[in-house]
Design a protein with these regions (language model features):
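Short secondary-structure boundary elements
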Residues: 18, 143, 150-354, 358-361, ...
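A short hydrophobic beta-strand->loop->alpha-helix junction that borders the nucleotide-binding pocket
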Residues: 2-9, 119-120, 143-144
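Sensor-1/coupling segment of RecA-like P-loop NTPase cores
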Residues: 100-142
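Extended alpha-helical scaffolding segments used for macromolecular assembly and cargo binding
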Residues: 259-263, 271, 275-278, 294-387, ...
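Helix-turn-helix DNA-binding segment
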Residues: 765, 807, 813-898
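Short coil/turn linkers that connect adjacent helices within long alpha-helical scaffolds
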Residues: 310-311, 326, 346-347, 362-366, ...
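Internal alpha-solenoid helical repeat scaffolds
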Residues: 255-256, 349, 353, 357, ...
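Conserved Walker-type P-loop NTP-binding/catalytic site
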Residues: 13-84, 130-133, 152-153, 193-194, ...
Length: 898
């Protein structure tokens, strides 16, 4: 049983350490390595002394990496035998430990693990505590008070078998049946020599609950002075105190400390075993509150210095300093800043913010105040604190050095835009920082320019201001520093959106990727920009390699955010290819990873692509539900990332027969896209989609105009998928012989493209047009090929249409018989493919950031649908489908880098 404590609340992962350190310390080297293997290694720095094993630089990721690692440490411990995690006084637990418990209880299914926690009923309203207590599988026990009869039994056991009934009733009335108060009341009565007779009932009432505290102090006052000094030291230091630390604070030698500890144990004040701890928090409170306020504060200040001199963890020192008043002490501010850095390295952002706020109150030396404000604002950004921007603004005002101002502006600008939606201010901040930078800071300058360009292409009010800078940026090619690579990637993405010729954009993107700097944690959106350019230029294999590299890095560092973002973008690439099952699996994985790890995706984009994928698979109702999760009905989400969402909702409305509404969404998408400099139809083919909607509404001339514009823009860009899609739409709008020629051109353009679904559409539309033109024999071949490709992609509505068109030509195509493989959900298919490659359930779970139980459920379902009994049969069962040959997720299992 481990226990929370008032002082320990300031110590990140205090409960976690209490729970796991004994098991790890008692394990031999081989078993310890086994316990901390795989994803559990992400938790190792908590127990290895060096808080910065993986560096401070991955602060945003470290919280989730630590939670993920602790979950797998728990799973590893439970492999040999069932595991019980018991915590008393959970309401006093530190917040990182509470966050971990909430994370754990949602993933316990299938693990032989029992979590038992005790807390005060009224404390359960705290959101983190409520997350644990209100879990659907939690069994909440609320023990009633002891009955009067039960109190009588305890009185007779403690004082005398002949205790008077009236005396026992008085004990019950004085304590209300609270077990702790009964225990302490009886100890107080025994220490005062009160006999349990009827005439002493009034004495019981006089002592009462408050008398319990007085009793502890009375017992303490009767002990030697050394015992009082040691009790005060342990009360100051908190529970589980090492004798050396308590002795140093009490100014006692070790022998005197041992004697005093034994004396306190006999007096039922301290526990008899080491480390030193009170028998109950109420006893500690009695000792602690018996000290004068000035004495308590002086004790905490001395304890902090004593712990620091003894090499204690920075957080232990900080826990003491948090109980002191500001005095302008440099040691205090420096110690709190150090503790904040270490807390951030493990994702304990709440604690880091508290430390830095207290450091600011100290206050630090004037020349360091700007640094503390910067550190505080950065920490608050990670915890979504509302004061983050204000603290970064204050830091910026106090800084004289233009380089420091530049780094602060970079942090503030990104935060204003991504968290606050304040693009105008973000642009002002970044532009001013760039103007102030000296010429010998090219790396920082290019990082600032890259951030500025990234913001501008997403915000209509900021974009016109950015246009004035673009020519100058192009005139001075970025260098090979990280900032240069980031700027090169941002320029490539901007020009690709603008519809510039494909070749120079791809060249820029590939140059930005050279050397691998963009895969680093500081590269921001750099690798995303490169991936987008490659994917929308139809270099889907190259884009896939970018995403695979990021996924491997995300697994190696436990970065759920990078894992989710790379899964989103890889899912997008799968969608563009037409691999709809893979696209759905990745997109759902991205969304689930974000939601289950405590942060929202924040963008409608993954929901939009998932809805598009579901529509192509014929699941309109599910697609509508996905979009409603972003904005129900006709609402518009309050985010800058509206374009993909608008397009997806427009396509859904058209498929639902609400063509006019769908057209309005597409036209609004086009208006917004152009306001952001967007002209490339590879990213948003709104013109061709609007043209087909206009055709359906009988507005052929406007449809022709939009279709012709898209052909021109697609030719300018030069990627087959975009041009093929534009030609197909124009062919449908034109009709007749010219329409047939355009559809034939679309098929030819797409013939060697990786965009299989778009090729299937073009083939089906060409065949259908030939059938309508009474050229049935010529219609059959494109329709057969369209049907085969649509089946391969999993595009059921398109396959059904191609099948119906083939029947109309007089052909007799065989209906596709759905095999067990076709019945697998995308998630089941993904897990089955990984298992077929030899990965264990644990390997798969760690790679996908899910639990082993989730993998077991997916595999069991897959076995049933495939008609097999074990994973040994998976390779043969999956190889039976051409759809899976050469595919699947090639996952190189990664462990935390050292």
């Amino acid at each position: 049983m481990r226990r929370g404590g008032e002082l320990e609340r300031e110590f990140p992962y205090g409960i976690v350490r209490q729970l796991f350190e004994p098991a790890l310390a008692g394990a031999d080297r081989a078993y310890r390595d086994e316990l901390l293997s795989g994803a559990a290694a992400f938790a190792a720095p908590l127990f290895c002394g060096d808080y910065l094993v993986r560096g401070e630089s991955r602060k945003a990721e470290s919280a989730f990496a630590t939670l993920h690692g602790l979950f797998w440490l728990t799973a590893n411990l439970s492999e040999r035998r069932p595991l019980v995690l018991a915590v008393d006084d959970l309401h006093w637990a530190d917040r990182p430990s509470l966050r971990w418990l909430g994370y754990l209880v949602r993933r316990l299914e299938g693990l032989p693990v029992l979590v038992v926690a005790c807390l005060r009923p009224k404390e359960a309203e705290d959101p983190l505590l409520a997350e644990v207590v209100s879990d659907p599988f939690a069994l909440v026990l609320r023990p009633p008070p002891l009955t009067e009869a039960a109190v009588g039994v305890l009185v007779r056991e403690a004082l005398s078998p002949d205790a008077d009934a009236g005396f026992c009733a008085a004990c019950f009335a004085a304590t209300g049946g609270n077990p702790l108060l009964v225990r302490e009341l009886l100890a107080a009565l025994a220490s005062q020599g009160v006999s349990p007779t009827a005439d002493k009932a009034a004495t019981v009432r006089q002592i009462g609950p408050e008398g319990v505290l007085r009793s502890v102090r009375l017992r303490l006052s009767r002990l030697p002075p050394e015992a009082g000094l040691l009790a005060s030291s342990v009360a100051i230091l908190g529970n589980d105190v090492e004798p050396h630390a308590a002795a140093a604070l009490a100014a006692l030698d070790l022998q005197a400390t041992a004697h005093a500890a034994a004396t306190l144990a006999r007096a039922d004040i301290l526990r008899p075993e080491l480390p030193l701890a009170f028998v109950h928090p109420v006893v500690r409170a009695a000792v602690y509150n018996g000290l004068a306020p000035a004495e308590r504060e002086r004790g905490h200040a001395m304890a902090a210095r004593t712990l620091a001199e003894r090499g204690a963890a920075a957080e232990q020192v900080a826990a003491q300093l948090m109980r002191t008043s500001p005095r302008g002490d440099r040691f205090v501010a420096a110690s709190l800043r150090d503790a904040a850095r270490r807390a951030l390295a493990h994702g304990a952002g709440d604690n880091a913010v508290a430390y830095l706020r207290r450091a600011l109150e100290e206050p630090p030396p004037r020349r360091e105040r700007a640094d503390v404000l910067y550190e505080l604002g950065s920490a608050e950004r990670l915890t979504l604190g509302p004061a983050a921007a204000d603290h970064l603004r204050q830091a910026l005002v106090l800084m004289d050095d233009p380089v420091r101002r530049g780094w602060t502006a970079l942090e503030l600008g990104r935060m204003l835009f991504w968290s606050g939606g304040l693009a105008d201010e973000a642009v002002d901040v970044l532009e001013k920082a760039i103007a102030e930078l000296p010429p010998d800071e090219p790396d920082l300058r290019q990082r600032l320019e890259a951030a500025l360009l990234t913001i501008a292409v997403e915000e209509p009010r900021a974009y016109p201001r950015m246009l004035q800078r673009l020519e100058r940026l192009r005139a001075h090619p970025p260098d090979t520093s990280l900032g240069g690579r980031m700027l090169l990637a941002a320029l490539a993405y901007h020009d690709a959106r603008a519809g510039a010729p494909l070749s120079p954009c791809v060249a820029r993107a590939e140059s930005a990727l050279a050397g691998g700097l963009l895969y680093g944690h500081e590269a921001g959106m750099g690798w995303c920009h490169v991936g987008f350019v490659l994917a929308y230029s139809d270099r889907l294999d190259a884009a896939g390699r970018v995403y695979e590299t990021v996924l491997a890095d995300a697994r190696a560092h436990g970065s759920v955010f990078a894992f989710a973002l790379a899964s989103l973008l890889r899912g997008t690439a799968f969608y563009l290819r037409g691999s709809l099952a893979d696209a759905e699996a990745d997109l759902r994985l991205a969304i689930d990873a974000c939601e289950s790890h405590g942060f929202a995706v924040g963008l409608p984009t993954p929901f939009a692509f998932l809805a598009d994928t579901l529509m192509e698979r014929g699941e309109l109702r599910t697609a509508a539900g996905v979009l409603d999760r972003v904005a129900a009905g006709d609402e518009v989400p309050k985010t800058v990332h509206l374009l993909s969402f608008r397009g997806s909702r427009g396509r859904l409305r058209i498929r639902q027969g609400r063509t006019r509404e769908g057209l309005a969404e597409l036209l609004e998408l086009g208006r917004r896209y152009e306001a952001l400099g967007g002209r490339n139809p590879a990213m948003h083919a709104w013109r061709s989609e609007a043209a087909l909607a206009l055709l359906e509404l009988g507005e052929r001339e406007e449809a022709r105009r939009l279709a012709a514009q898209e052909i021109e823009l697609a030719r300018q860009w030069g990627a087959p998928r975009a041009l093929g899609k534009a030609l197909r739409a124009a062919g449908l709008v034109e009709g007749g012989q010219r329409g047939l020629a355009l559809l034939h051109d679309a098929v030819e353009v797409l013939e060697d493209s990786a965009a299989l679904l778009e090729r299937a559409r073009a083939l089906t539309d060409l065949g259908a047009a030939r059938r309508r033109a009474n050229r049935r024999a010529e219609a059959r071949e494109p329709l057969r090929r369209g049907l085969e490709l649509a089946d391969h992609c999993g595009a059921r509505p398109l396959a059904e249409r191609a099948h119906a068109e083939l029947l109309a030509t007089g052909a007799r195509p065989r209906r596709r018989v759905l095999s067990g493989l076709d019945a697998l959900t995308p998630s089941e298919r993904r897990v089955a493919l990984m298992a077929a490659e030899g990965m264990t359930n644990r390997d798969i779970a760690q790679a996908l950031f899910v639990t082993s139980r989730t993998v077991e459920v997916h595999l069991s379902s897959a076995y049933r649908k495939l008609g097999i009994g074990s994973r040994l049969q998976l390779p043969r069962a999956l190889a039976a489908s051409p759809e899976t040959r050469g595919e699947g997720e090639r996952v190189a299992l990664a462990t935390p880098s050292s």
